Each structure stands twice: as C-alpha cells, then as structure tokens.
Design a protein with these regions (language model features):
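ATP-dependent carboxylate activation and anion-phosphoryl transfer catalytic cores
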Residues: 7-23, 48, 71-73, 96, ...
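Acidic/histidine-enriched active-site and ligand-binding environments that engage anionic O-linkages
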Residues: 147-156
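Structural detector of well-ordered beta-strand residues that form the stable sheet scaffold
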Residues: 29, 79, 101-103, 131, ...
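A cross-family glycoside hydrolase active-site/sugar-binding cleft signature
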Residues: 31, 81, 133, 200, ...
C-alpha cells in the first residue's frame, strides 16, 4: 500500500481524498495556489505546498510544479480528483515515468475514451448500443450535411475531445448546419486545442443515466448501479439520484452489463463512469466514458455502502476488488444537490465573496461535502460549486423530504447561491412524480426563478 499520496486538486474533492487517506493510514500531501492558501484542504493535509498563482494554468494545471512537489516530498502516488489533470493522458504518463502511481486508468485508455469518435467505434465493436451518427470524424461542412440527411434531423455536433457541454451544438435543420458546425468547431479549438468533430442523431427529451464502474488489475469488473443525472442546465448537472425511477430491474441489469462490456473492451482499470441517454421509447445509447471519479460519486456511496475513493486507492495499489457483482445492492434512495456560488435571478452570475455566516445541517442520512467555513473567501478564479448536499432515505419520497429539510436549514450568507432554486425544484410536481428528463430545467426555469 502507498505511504504518501499527493492530491493534485483543490476544493471539496481534495478534502474528500485527504480524509480517505488519513483513514487508510496514508500521508496526504496538498498543493495549492496563492488564492487557496487558507483553504480547508491545505489545513487538513499532512503537508501542503504552493504551486503557483491563482490562475489554474499556472497552478492546478502546472504539471511540472505538481510533479516536482510529489517527487521532492517523497510521494509514491498521485490522485488527480476530478477536473484539472484528471483526464490528461500526458500527466498520467508523466506520473508513471517519475516512478509514481497515477490513481486512475492508463494514459492510453484516457486517450481512447477522451476521443469521443474513437470511443464510439470501440463501443460498436463491443456490442454496446450507440446513437446513429458519423463513423469517425467529420472533415467538412458538405460531408456533415450528407451524414445529417442520412440519419435525419435533429442532430448533435460534438467535439471529439469535448466535455462539459463545450464544443457542442444542436442543429434542427440543414440551413443552420454550417453555422452550428463552424461555431462548435471554433469553440472546441479554443477550449481543447482540438477541433476534430463528429455527429450523432439528437435524441429528444432523454434521461441521462450513468453507471459507476470499478475494475481492478486482475480482470474483475463490476458496476455499482446507476445515477440519474437528468436535472441539468446547459449540459451541466445540478442534481443526481440513485436509483433512477425510470429503470426497471431488468433494464438496470441490461444497462449495467453493457457498462461492464464497455469497460472490458478498453481494458479499463480503476473507477470510471459509463454514460447513456435513455430515450422516451425505452432504448438507450452510449454517450461517453468518464475516466475519473465523478462529482456525484457520493450518491452511489450512499446506496451501496462502498467507499469509491478507498477502492480507487486499493486498485491503484494492485489489490483485488473487495466486492463481487453479487455483493452490490442498492439500498434505499440517495439524492445530491450541487450548491453553486451564483445568482439564478441574474442569469446565474457567479458570486464570489466572503462567507459571513454559515450553518451546516445534520441528521440521519445527511452528508455535506464542502470546504466552506465562516470567513472563507469564495474565489472568482475557480468553478462555482462550493458544496454538495447528499441525503439518503428508505425511498425516493423520503429522500426528497429530507433534502427539502436540509436545504431549508442550510445557511450560507455573504454570497448568492442556487440553494433556493434547488429547493423549489424539489417541490415541482413533475420532479416529485419522476416525470423529468434533460429538458426539465429549460422548460421550468422561468417559473422557478420567478417563484422566488
């Protein structure tokens, strides 16, 4: 087992990993930017080192500085968390070249799954259903139009190296295709340095369902059930839950088996997530595989009792999985709300500032992952997510009621948050009944914001 792990991240995920390391008897090394000098992950780590100024490109994305700290402090592994360098194949390879273990899949697998058109082709070979679309990259507007005519509008133009909703455009008719394609291509180049594009049939009003995977070095692969991530705004998830009301046990087993097939096809090792869209007609299709721990991993932990970060570390240390598929049972229901420092009434304007007052609720089946404390400075330099509120109940209605109670108790003063919007969603009748898909926020946002 590892003796010392560097956490190449910040915020609540860095705190989550540090706590896990301490529980496993492993020393934790934090890195931080000058803007994060007083952050909680810095205070909780056994050692902490400044790696640069506030700008992410000069700190949390600075591979040279991170690897230097890891080497000089005697670390034998690096955990990348999510975001930043977590899906950077170059970084994964450099960690290994420096004689340390990257807690995640290999650089080759990250490359394969990071290129969405390559991943799509591999899923076809594995027998995993994919959305009808282009076979490989689109080389020109005319080629794209020809493919779109073949599969039928509407279509979704996507960056092969994309993620987080960037480098992506919907197109409903041919006369709009050229503009949508060129806009998505330019955005992909700006965001990812790669303007390789592909295209899929746009599935209207789907559910976004993802399956959590664990795979070890000995060929053992299991899934830990699904998470329903359909409540999202502009392709950014807001709420997640498990299990999904939309899945029968038969469909759950079928999708879970396909998720395992996907992981086995690429020789996946460590924790990963296989994402699907579930169409209104009950058919489902592979979207992508995320080669890292997910923001919403606590939802799965609450219903399975499996510590996913602990399993990540064990797998990276070449230990066998602690669980067989038959050991995995989804007990009760879990729900997560992401709390962001933003103002929904002002177009979700970011709201940096000092947290002047804070009350963190508790109770049975309540978990709050955050780095907030009274006096904490929410920075304008980083992602707006400042907390994750997770609850567990015996069933979906119980967890919804519990989340309403927790959000009504949560106090974060000094900055604006989306807390009240989340609270209102939990009272919306379609949401409570489970009648929602990825278009829910788009359809209900105006009435929810005006209800405040």
């Amino acid at each position: 087992m590892f003796k010392k792990i560097l956490i190449a991240n910040r915020g609540e995920i860095a705190v989550r990993i540090i706590r896990c390391c301490k529980e496993m008897g492993i020393e934790a090394v934090a890195v931080y930017s000058s803007a994060d000098a007083t952050s909680l992950h810095v205070q909780l780590a056994d050692e902490a080192y400044c790696i640069g100024p506030a700008k992410s490109s000069e700190s949390y994305l600075n591979m040279e500085n991170i690897l230097s700290v890891a080497t000089l402090s005697g670390c034998d592994a690096i955990h990348p968390g999510f975001g930043y360098l977590s899906e950077n194949s170059t970084f994964a390879r450099l960690v290994e070249k420096c004689g340390m273990t990257f807690i995640g899949p290999s650089g080759d697998v990250i490359d394969q799954m990071g290129n969405k058109s390559v991943a799509r082709q591999m899923m076809i070979e594995a027998g995993v259903p994919v959305v009808p679309g282009s076979d490989g990259s689109i080389e020109s507007v005319s080629q794209g139009k020809e493919i779109a005519r073949k599969i039928g509008y509407p279509v979704l133009i996507k960056a092969s190296a994309g993620g987080g909703g960037r480098g992506m455009r919907k197109c409903f008719k041919e006369e709009d295709f050229e503009n949508a394609y060129l806009t998505a291509k330019a955005e992909a180049k700006a965001c990812f340095g790669d303007d390789d594009m592909y295209m899929e049939k746009l599935i209207l009003n789907p559910k976004h369902i993802e399956f959590q995977i664990l795979a070890d070095h000995f060929g053992n692969v299991i899934h830990l059930g699904e998470r329903d991530c359909s409540i999202q705004r502009r392709n950014q998830k807001m709420m997640e839950e498990s299990p999904s009301k939309a899945l029968s046990q038969e469909l759950r087993e079928k999708m879970g088996n396909d998720a395992i097939k996907a992981a086995k096809k690429v020789g996946y090792v460590n924790a990963g997530t296989v994402e699907f869209v579930l169409a209104p007609d009950g058919k489902y299709y592979f979207i992508e595989m995320n080669t890292r721990i997910q923001v919403e991993h606590p939802v799965t932990e609450m219903v399975t009792g499996v510590d996913l970060v602990r399993e990540q570390i064990r797998i990276a240390a070449h230990l066998k999985l602690n669980y067989k598929q038959s050991d995995i049972e989804l007990k009760g229901h879990a729900l997560e709300c992401r709390i962001n420092a933003e103002n929904p009434q002002e177009g979700f304007r970011p709201s940096p500032g000092i947290v002047s007052s804070l009350h963190i609720p508790g109770g049975f089946g309540v978990r709050i992952d955050t780095t907030l404390y009274q006096g904490y400075q929410v920075s304008s330099h980083y992602d707006s997510m400042i907390a994750k509120v997770i609850v567990h109940g015996r069933n979906r209605i119980e967890s919804i009621r519990k989340m309403r109670r927790v959000l009504s108790e949560l106090v974060i003063d000094g900055i604006d948050t989306n807390q009240e919007l989340q609270y209102l969603i939990l009272h919306e009748s379609d949401y409570v009944k489970g009648n929602f898909d990825t278009s829910f926020i788009e359809k209900h946002l105006d009435e929810l914001v005006n209800e405040r």
